[in-house]
A protein has these predicted regions:
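Gly/Ser-rich catalytic serine loop of serine hydrolases
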Residues: 10, 88-96, 154-158, 204-219, ...
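C-terminal recognition in membrane/secretory proteostasis and scaffolding
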Residues: 1-29, 45, 131, 145, ...
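Active-site loop architecture of trypsin-fold serine endopeptidases
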Residues: 43, 115-118, 151, 171-184, ...
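Terminal peptide-recognition signature
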Residues: 52-58, 79, 96, 103-107, ...
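Conserved active-site neighborhood of the chymotrypsin/trypsin-like protease fold
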Residues: 91-93, 98-179, 193, 201, ...
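Glycine-biased strand-turn-strand hairpin within the trypsin-fold
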Residues: 25-45, 49-105, 113-116, 126-127, ...
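Soluble non-cytosolic domains of exported or imported proteins
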Residues: 37-41, 49, 64, 145, ...
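Short, conserved beta-turn/loop elements at beta-strand boundaries and strand-helix junctions
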Residues: 62, 116, 135-139, 188-194, ...
C-alpha cells in the first residue's frame, strides 16, 4: 500500500513542479483589482466632489380643490356669500445643481413651474428660499438663486466628449431620499423624438432616476457635471407608470450652461435665427447614412435671404463643420448670437 501511494504522489508532485517551471517563463497578468488606478472599485471620490453642489428642491403651490357642496344651499350662501371655493397646498419635490458661487441653481422647469414657494435644502443641512431667475420651457430648464455664503459650484465636464459606454453617476432626491446616488453607463447620445421639449438632445443612461430626481446631477467618473437628469422613460410612455425600466434621459451640460447664462444675463434665452425653414433629407455616402438640410422656406428679408440662399439649396456645412445630423445642426444655429457672422456652404 505504501508503494502504491508513493507512486501516485510522485507524478503529481512532478507535474506541479513542471508547471511552475513552464509558467515562470511567461509574464503573468496582475490580478484584477490589485491597483486602484487600473480597476475602479469605488466612485466615492467623485461623489464626494459633486454632492455638495447638488440640492434638494421642495415646492408648494395653492390649487383650487373645487366648491364645498354644502355651499350649494341657497340659505348658506345668503349668510356666507359666494366665496365657497376651497384651496389646498400641493407639494412636490425635485433636485438641482449649484453652478455659480452666487447661488445660481439649474433645475428642470417642470420641477418649479407654477410654484408659489420654493425651498432649497443643501447637503450640509442649510436651507433657503429660492427666487426664480428665469425659465426656458423649450429646453425644460430653469434657474433659481439662493442667498447663502460658502456655496460650492460644481465643476463642469464637456458633454460633447461623452461616449457610449462611459460610466456615469446620478445624484438626486428620489422620493425625498436626498442626495441618493446611482451608477450606470451612457446607453446612447443625442436622443430625441419624445416631444417633451422643443430642443431635444438627451444623454440616455441606465443610472436609476425616479420621481424627485429631475433636475439632479449626472456626473462622470471624475465627479464633473455631464448633464441634468430630466426625464424617466416609463413602461406606459405617459408617465403614469413610474416603474424603472432603465431608460433615463439627461440634458447635456453644454446646453444647460448656455441656457443658464442667458437666463441670468437676459432673463430669457436668446437664440440665433437664420430665417429659414428646412427639411431633413437622408443621403447615402458610401456605407454611411447622413442627414442634410434642404431649405424649404425663406423669411422675406431674413438673414438667409439677404445672404443669397434660395429655396431648394442644400446646406452642406456651417462654419466649416459638415452637416451630418440636421437636427443637431439646427440646435447649433439656435446657440448662435444675433449679429454673429456664419459661413454657410451649399
Amino acid at each position: 500500500m505504501r508503494e502504491f501511494l508513493s507512486s501516485l504522489f510522485w507524478p503529481t508532485l512532478t507535474g506541479i513542479l513542471a508547471a511552475a517551471i513552464i509558467l515562470d517563463q511567461w509574464v503573468l497578468p496582475e490580478p484584477m483589482g490589485r491597483d486602484r488606478n487600473q480597476v475602479r472599485t469605488s466612485y466615492s471620490d467623485a461623489v464626494a466632489l459633486a454632492t455638495p453642489s447638488v440640492v434638494n428642491i421642495y415646492t408648494a403651490k395653492l390649487v383650487d380643490s373645487g366648491r364645498n357642496q354644502r355651499l350649494n344651499d341657497p340659505l348658506l350662501r345668503r349668510f356666507l356669500g359666494n366665496s365657497g371655493r376651497r384651496q389646498q397646498v400641493e407639494r412636490s419635490l425635485g433636485s438641482g445643481v449649484i453652478l455659480t458661487p452666487e447661488g445660481h441653481i439649474i433645475t428642470n422647469d417642470h420641477v418649479i413651474a407654477d410654484a408659489d414657494a420654493i425651498q432649497v435644502l443643501l447637503h450640509d443641512g442649510r436651507s433657503a428660499t429660492a427666487t426664480v431667475i428665469g425659465a426656458d420651457p423649450a429646453t425644460d430648464l430653469a434657474v433659481l438663486q439662493i442667498d447663502l455664503p460658502g456655496l460650492t459650484p460644481i465643476t463642469l465636464a464637456n458633454s460633447d466628449d461623452a461616449k457610449v459606454g462611459d460610466v456615469v453617476l446620478a445624484i438626486g432626491n428620489p422620493y425625498g431620499f436626498g442626495h441618493s446616488v446611482s451608477q450606470g453607463i451612457i446607453s446612447g447620445l443625442s436622443r430625441y423624438g419624445l416631444q417633451a421639449s422643443d430642443y431635444e438632445d438627451y444623454i440616455q443612461t441606465d443610472a436609476s432616476s425616479l420621481l424627485g430626481s429631475s433636475g439632479g446631477a449626472l456626473i462622470d467618473a471624475s465627479g464633473k457635471l455631464l448633464g441634468i437628469n430630466t426625464l424617466i422613460y416609463t413602461a406606459s410612455g405617459d408617465g403614469a407608470d413610474h416603474a424603472a425600466i432603465g431608460i433615463n434621459l439627461a440634458t447635456p451640460v453644454n446646453l444647460a450652461n448656455f441656457v443658464m447664462k442667458d437666463l441670468v444675463n437676459y432673463g430669457t434665452v436668446v437664440r440665433g435665427w437664420l430665417g429659414v425653414s428646412v427639411e431633413l433629407l437622408q443621403t447615402q455616402e458610401t456605407s454611411v447614412q447622413q442627414q442634410v438640410l434642404m431649405i424649404s422656406g425663406l423669411a422675406e428679408d431674413g438673414p438667409a435671404a439677404r445672404a443669397g440662399l434660395r429655396l431648394g439649396d442644400v446646406i452642406n456645412a456651417i462654419n466649416g463643420n459638415t452637416v451630418n445630423d440636421g437636427r443637431i445642426t439646427m440646435h447649433q444655429i439656435a446657440r448662435l448670437r444675433p449679429g454673429e457672422v456664419v459661413d454657410i456652404e451649399v
